[in-house]
Amino acid sequence: MSQEIVDRVRNYLSPNIPVTPISQGAEAVVFTTSVHPYLPENCNSNEKYIIKYRSPKRYRHPVIDKSLTKHRTLGEARLLSKLYTIEGLHVPKLIACDAYNGYLWLEFLGEDLPENFGYSNLKNFLWMYDAKNDPYCEVVKRALIEVGEQIGKLHWNDYCHGDLTSSNIVMVHSDTDSHHWVPHLIDFGLGSTTTMVEDKGVDIYVLERAILSTHSQHAEQYIEWMLDGFKSVYEKNGKLGKKKLDELLKRFAEVRLRGRKRSMIG
């Protein structure tokens, strides 16, 4: 990660706001902080927050870059605000947005998994149970069914994630049940509003490929559980839900077939 970007973020924030860089993607750099943007700086808090920063891209004209950064940051903020109001859908809470400078301040989700398995995204969560030689236990089954339900609720409300990998699903330990992990969808930088079954089919296919690439030995069962949860959301919505589900699964099969052909051809 570029030290220049880290220094820019620290200069933008107050010197009394500590930030720790945790990841860098193609579009943004992600930091954690213990300071809430609207509380006094000397207010002690045990909470953690996410700061997502879209840094300037030198290959773009500065005026175009500024416009794109503002548009994309504001778009993600608006999308998160809408998703947060959907009953039963788990996404991070938006705390603050500075679209002009490319900053989002978000609720921090997840935790460090035991035995050095890293941050509690779905990928690491499944690896942890695989290492325990218990990849098909009820905890994993329930988690994957609920992952499917989250995607189903997202799609039923005509939204798509756009980058639905197992790293962008965070498992949050339930406060009331030590064996229950609640999936939350994060990183909606490529998310959108859409009614197109193609977009939704691609969303599911991207997650399927992610699970196949990192958990190939158990992927068939994992994907089956995930799809069971996904289908259940649509099936609860009567004839219309069944009709939409049939259309979506048909398109998903077509997307999957195209992906396999592409893999064979190279």
From Swiss-Prot:
The keyword Transmembrane does not apply. It catalyses: L-seryl-[protein] + ATP = O-phospho-L-seryl-[protein] + ADP + H(+); L-threonyl-[protein] + ATP = O-phospho-L-threonyl-[protein] + ADP + H(+). ATP binds at residues 22-30, 52. Keywords: Activator, ATP-binding, Chromosome, Cytoplasm, Hydrolase, Kinase, Nucleotide-binding, Nucleus, Phosphoprotein, Serine/threonine-protein kinase, Telomere, Transcription, Transcription regulation, Transferase, tRNA processing. It is found in: Cytoplasm; Nucleus; Chromosome, Telomere. GO terms for cellular component: chromosome, telomeric region; cytosol; EKC/KEOPS complex; nucleus. Its EC number is 3.6.-.-, 2.7.11.1. GO terms for molecular function: ATP binding; ATP hydrolysis activity; protein serine kinase activity; protein serine/threonine kinase activity. It holds the Pfam family Kdo. InterPro entries: Bud32 (IPR022495), Kinase-like_dom_sf (IPR011009), Prot_kinase_dom (IPR000719), Tyr_kinase_AS (IPR008266). Residues 16-266 form the Protein kinase domain. The active site is at residue 163. The keyword Plastid does not apply. GO terms for biological process: positive regulation of transcription by RNA polymerase II; telomere maintenance via recombination; tRNA processing; tRNA threonylcarbamoyladenosine metabolic process. PANTHER family: EKC_KEOPS COMPLEX SUBUNIT TP53RK, NON-SPECIFIC SERINE/THREONINE PROTEIN KINASE. Component of the EKC/KEOPS complex that is required for the formation of a threonylcarbamoyl group on adenosine at position 37 (t(6)A37) in tRNAs that read codons beginning with adenine. The complex is probably involved in the transfer of the threonylcarbamoyl moiety of threonylcarbamoyl-AMP (TC-AMP) to the N6 group of A37. BUD32 has ATPase activity in the context of the EKC/KEOPS complex and likely plays a supporting role to the catalytic subunit KAE1. The EKC/KEOPS complex also promotes both telomere uncapping and telomere elongation. Component of the EKC/KEOPS complex composed of at least BUD32, CGI121, GON7, KAE1 and PCC1; the whole complex dimerizes. Belongs to the protein kinase superfamily. BUD32 family. This is EKC/KEOPS complex subunit BUD32. The gene is BUD32.
